[in-house]
Design a protein with these regions (language model features):
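Vicinal oxygen chelate
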Residues: 2-24, 48-123, 132-158, 170-178
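Short, contiguous, helix-prone interaction/anchoring segments in small proteins
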Residues: 25-30, 36-39, 45
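Basic side chains
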Residues: 30-32, 51-52
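Conserved active-site tyrosine of GNAT-family acetyltransferases
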Residues: 37-42, 65, 135, 162
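Short glycine-/small-residue motifs
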Residues: 167
Length: 178
């Protein structure tokens, strides 16, 4: 069966040929301390660092992370690896502005408090109960557990910078919104 888009007001059902080949590559979060953020995203959520880029003249670093198989062929050449990183799908970019990690009261706005803006990232997992147990074992803070609230079988955790991360098991969501 081929893909058929849902029809809603404002939806262009036939994307222009000029957009063929466009790929959603990454979304970016600003982080206070890259060591803490990288530990969370690699150890707790299983992402791998694809590339780090430093910009000393502007005093910031970019870390690009994604889920990749261990046997994935990654270019050794720095330029080729950068180009490869920007060709991937589902990448998370963490931006660290140098010095923020030493400011005790420094905090980024997560977008969920007023004024609202950015909401959350979402990770799908094969077993929601096992994921919840994993997060509990590692003392990851929950915003919402799967059995709380009106929307069941959906969890929200927080990363070290307070950003919300939705955790879902796709098979449990078949009746969502029905």
């Amino acid at each position: 069966m081929s893909f058929s888009t849902e029809h809603h007001p404002g939806v262009d059902t036939e994307p222009d040929a000029a957009t063929r080949g466009f790929v959603f590559n990454h979304s970016m979060l600003r982080v206070k301390d890259p060591a803490i953020a990288l530990d969370f995203y690699t150890r707790i959520l299983g992402l791998r660092v694809l590339r780090k880029l430093d910009f000393p003249e502007m005093r910031f670093s970019l870390y690009f992370l994604a889920h990749r198989p261990p046997d994935d062929a990654v270019p050794d050449d720095a330029g080729e690896r950068t180009a490869w990183t920007f060709s991937q799908r589902g990448v998370l970019e963490l931006t660290h502005n140098w010095g923020s990690e030493t400011q005790a009261d420094f905090k980024y706005h997560d977008g969920n408090a007023q004024p609202q803006g950015f909401g959350h990232l979402c990770f799908s997992v094969p077993d929601l109960d096992a994921a919840v147990a994993w997060f509990d074992q590692h003392q990851v803070p929950f915003v919402k557990r799967p059995d709380q609230g009106k929307m069941k079988d959906v969890a929200f955790i927080q990363d070290p910078d307070g950003y919300w991360i939705e955790i879902v098991e796709p098979a449990r969501l078949k009746k969502l919104g029905c």
